Amino acid sequence: MKFDRVTGKCVDLSFEGKGVVKLSYGTVFVDGLFPGEEAEIEIQYKRAGSYFGKVFRLITKSKDRIQPKCGVCTACGGCQLQQLSYPAQLEYKTKKVADAFRRHKIENIRVLPCISAEKPYEYRNKIQVPIGRDPHGHIVSGFYRSGTHKIIPIDKCWIEDPRAGKIILELKNLMKQFHYAPYDEDTRSGLVRHVLIRTSAHYDEVMVTLVTNKDEFKGKNNFVKEWIKRCPNIKSLIQNINTRDTNVILGERERTLFGPSFIKDSILGVDFLISSKSFFQVNPEQVEKLYRKAIDFADLNEDENIFDAYCGIGTISLCTSKYVKKVTGVEIVKEAIVDARKNANINNITNAEFLLGDAGEVFEKLVSDGEKYSTVFVDPPRKGLDQKFIDTLLRLEPNKVVYVSCDPETLARDIKLLSEKYEIKAIQPVDMFPMTFHVETVACLRLKE
């Protein structure tokens, strides 16, 4: 069956933004094929009873197909929807969230239209790029071809902050000047493995993390001085040392080569210190819309205490603090709690406390000690809420739960479990990741009367 060619019509887009083609012997998922389009498809492989293929020849085009800005988006795989018009992307994401709830047998709900981005390009404040050589031996940067470790050379990524491109260009120039070789996975030789760049939307600050295969390297001080001279908006330069034979990008050890070990950015007027490994939402424009919607859904008042599970570096906690009497944030990652406390201090916020531990255990202990929380915010990782925390919510019955999710499937799964005692008041997708199949969602639940 592999490399066979078949003709079929796309009837839908999958959860991962692939075209869905129904044939007599099964379903074929096709990259870059959109609803209503007919194509000759080359089958690539079969997995778990489904076929996966690519467009060999497009027979009919959708009215929503557009010319992409990026010439390699079909090979890179990072922008699965860049050939789809932006209004059609928003419709897909709204439907994607609604479909997730239907799959979990949650009926009679209305998913609000996905909130659009004013800047669907050049929005990402974080980018990580491998450094390597092309077949001619030239130093290149870019992204791995989908499903491989072969670098597609890219000088401009259309969804990254444009400040990153200049910094990467100068890195490659300086590598030639200082005779620094890119890392070679086969021989495990060479110096530079990756470069990670974080940019601040509200301050002209950039953090660069250079991932190297060696601890020390010749000419390091002069290399750093020259890079900063050419790119003066670099406010923090970190060396991450990764000498392991691994696909994991970052090593355990880091040192600061220039500036502080953080940069500063802002959400809804609250400043945050961001270190190299901090989790911080990648779209600064859209995260403000997301948090405003979450705060609106919560309908907070100045007399209530709220609980923020999975609080990270305190973004939701600190953005909500001015609306309530007290906010308690809990996170299981020690470094994040340290950062959250620093962020409260630099903003002179005194009604936010941050506790290290399991969210369910801490919540239960605080309530047993007499604390009362009318609203709980949750913003878990992609895997969703822990069952233990869901059980705690059902047992302790806070009046409102505001759920921020990066995965509609786990959101719908968790809300199905919570529907034993909670009813859905609102579901709002937000397009945090234009040009990709990903979508962020905020849902508001209230305790049933």
Question: Across the structure, where does each feature detected by a protein language model lie?
Answer:
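Terminal RNA-binding accessory module
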Residues: 1-68, 72, 353, 361
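Rossmann-like S-adenosyl-L-methionine
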Residues: 2-6, 15, 215, 219-449
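Short, acidic/hydrophobic/Gly-rich beta-strand patch recurrent on exposed beta strands
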Residues: 19-24, 142-145, 209-211, 340
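Conserved "cap/hinge" positions at secondary-structure junctions
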Residues: 43-45, 131, 199
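Extended interfacial segments that mediate partner engagement and assembly in macromolecular machines
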Residues: 56-68, 75-182, 202, 217
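Short, solvent-exposed loop/turn elements at beta->coil junctions and helix N-caps
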Residues: 112-120, 185-186, 193-194, 198, ...
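Short, aliphatic-rich beta-strand segments
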Residues: 197, 203-213, 271-275
